[in-house]
Amino acid sequence: MKVLSFTFLALVLSVTAVSAQRNVTPAIDRDPLLEADALHNLDVAWQAFGPARKAYKQVLGRFEETYAAYPEFSKIDEFLYLAGMSSYYLSKNEGKQEVNLKIEREREKYDPQRLRENAVAYLSMMLERNPESKYRENAEKVIKELKPDE
């Protein structure tokens, strides 16, 4: 009787395990072409963000292009972090790409006050979308520095 009960229990557990392996449809239907293009842009942005290049204007360009075309990107929190930190560094006149304030378009886009506001907006959006982000601690530190009254 014990052998029969044990066999029945093993059979029930195996059927349960198999039914748990059903195909799960993703919560968000992602376009594979847009996802691949966004992943490429993210990779290029990380390379530009790194200590060797510090090309923060390029990072912002890649972010703006990707966010405009595909705001549902699966790794948008990384992009928001890069955009926020790039805005922050540019507002402090850091980086290897020069901002030419004689050109009106660059003067408007890279105005230090506007960059600080953008940094807070991007980092806050990142925290709102993904509160458990691995970039959370650094983002909160920068937001606190830029908005000390809150």
Language-model features: locations:
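Acidic, polar-rich low-complexity tracts and alpha-helical solenoid repeat scaffolds
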Residues: 2-6, 15-150
